[in-house]
Each structure stands twice: as C-alpha cells, then as structure tokens.
Amino acid sequence: VLPDLDDLLSDAHVVALPMRVRFRGITVREALVLRGPAGWTEFSPFVEYDDAEAAAWLRAAVDFGWATHEPAADSVPVNATVPAIAPDGVADLLARYPGCTTAKVKVAEPGTTIDDDVARVAEVRRVLGPSAAVRVDANGLWSVDSAAEALERLAPFDLQYAEQPCRTVPELAELRQRIAGLGVPIAADESVRKASDPLAVARAGAADVLVVKAQPLGGITAARAVVADAGLPCVVSSALDTSVGLGMGAFLAAEAMSPGYAAGLGTAAMFTSDVSAAALLPVDGRVPVRRVEVDRDLLERNAASPERAAWWLARLERVHALLAG
C-alpha cells in the first residue's frame, strides 16, 4: 500500500555525499533518505532517470520503510570495487576493503583504452593473488567486437565473469556465443534493472549470472521474485546507495544470493562521509545484515543545497503521483 505523500515527507532528508574517486562520472552522490514505521529507507534513482524509471525506486523505499523484513543471515560477503583508476592507485584502494577476496574492476570507461583496462586488471590480480575472484564491469559500453577483443585479452586473468559487456540483450547473446571457448561467463546488470522485463535476458540465453539491485527492481520483495523466476545464479549489488540503501541490499542478499559469490554491497567505502556513524563498511570482507540508524548531525553536515533538495522533493512528489495513479 502506498503511504500518503505527507507520510513520506514527514521525516525526509536530501543528502549529497562526496565520493573519494569519480565513479559513474559523478563525484557527489545525491540521495533522499526517509523514515517509515519499519525504519529508515532510501529513494535515490540517479538524477538522469525519468519519473517512470524512478517509480520502481520509490516502491523499493516504501517496501523497506513500511514493511517488516527479517534478516536471513548475520552478514554477507562483499566485493571491493575498483573504479577506472591508474594501476598505481589499486593497492591503496583495495586496502579500503579489508578481508575482501573478490574485486569488481570497472573497464571500458570513456577516455580510457583497453591497454589501461588490462593494466588495471593485472594489478588487481597481482595485489589480491591467484585465489581471489576478479570480475570486470563494462556498463554496456562495448560493441560485440570490442567486447570479444577485450575479453580475449582479459581472460588470462581468470575472470569470475564480465558484467554487462554490451548494452542490449541480443548483443549479449551474440557475444556469449562468440566467446564460448574463453571461459568467461557473462553477467547482466543493466539488462535486468533497466528493463521493462527483467527476465528477458535469462530467457534469451544471454547471460550466465544475473546482477540484481533492490531499488531499481522495486524492493526486496519484487527483487526476490525476479531471482526465483530467473533460474540463474544471482549476485546482489548496490546502486551506489547510502548505507541505508545498502542495508536494503544486504537484506536481499542474505535471502536471495547464490552461494560462492560476493555481493556488490561494499560501496560505502567509496564515500568520504555517509548518513550514519555506523556506516555499512566492509569488515573481514563482509557487511552486516541490519537496518542502519541515521545520524541527524550527519544529515545536516551532508545536506544537499536548498535548490537540489527542492528538486528531489519535487521529484518524490511527481513519482508518488505516478504510483498513486
């Protein structure tokens, strides 16, 4: 049931969290955190998303803030996330993820080359050692030809999978056939979370692994249903959420994630400040499955400008009207 707009707005705060390194082209992550009867929750669709796409994110916020969810485990394993940085920054960056034995490495970033990607992945493999799991994420930026060429060069680093190497489901299916002999599984992320039909990629035989995110799929309950219907291994990941949204992801991961994989929920390490003093940071390679209590002084310290706050509150109002129909 959709709460009244007044209920959503009664304890709602817009924050702008500074990031240690540029990620997804941004250096500040804006989010709206709000308090429901079940606890703090989050609404943080990326600013470029339209209201129709943002609607799932509001459903997720309501699902987590207005419904009770029991933790299915005490903690979940998480991966380190390596942005498109130079190899000499890799060791310091990985040190922010103590105990993590899986790393996700961003590749195909605009302005970088495949040589840059190879050097970065090689350094991650060197620092973490031969037994660690290394995955790459291209965010759909390669063509089929570029992806095939890049993955041929990256395959010797023993990749756990390549996440969203190409943008469309037909491209993923074509690439998967073409590189079948390489031993690099394909994972789908954008093809799940940005699709009107998140299971199309599974039916098309276009992926070996699904990456699922709580907010874009409409919340824990909706995402769990996608996982159950997919029939593929699933990895739960963050949408660069604050620690509040990471808590939502951790609840989902504890319930729905395939064993043997680490969740992409260690991303609080990418912020210089968060909404809670007890941020959901990785310890011994894991994050706890718990609701995060927000600190009022951090809400104040990280408050977005009045203009940005007004923009987010207007967006919340429009998306609420869309869901209220």
Protein language model regions, located:
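Flexible C-terminal active-site loop/helix
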Residues: 1-13, 17-31, 40-45, 66-67, ...
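Active-site- and interface-proximal helix/loop "cap" or "latch" segments in soluble metabolic
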Residues: 6, 47-73
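Hydrophobic faces of well-ordered beta-strands that scaffold small-molecule active sites
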Residues: 13, 39-43, 74-83, 101-105, ...
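Active-site mouth loops of central-metabolism enzymes
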Residues: 17-26, 74-90, 106-110, 137-144, ...
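Glycine-rich, proline-tolerant flexible connector loops at the mouths of alpha/beta enzymes
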Residues: 42-52, 101-122
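Short, charged beta->alpha transition segments
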Residues: 65-68, 80-96, 110, 118-123
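Catalytic core of soluble alpha/beta enzymes
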Residues: 110-253, 272-275, 280
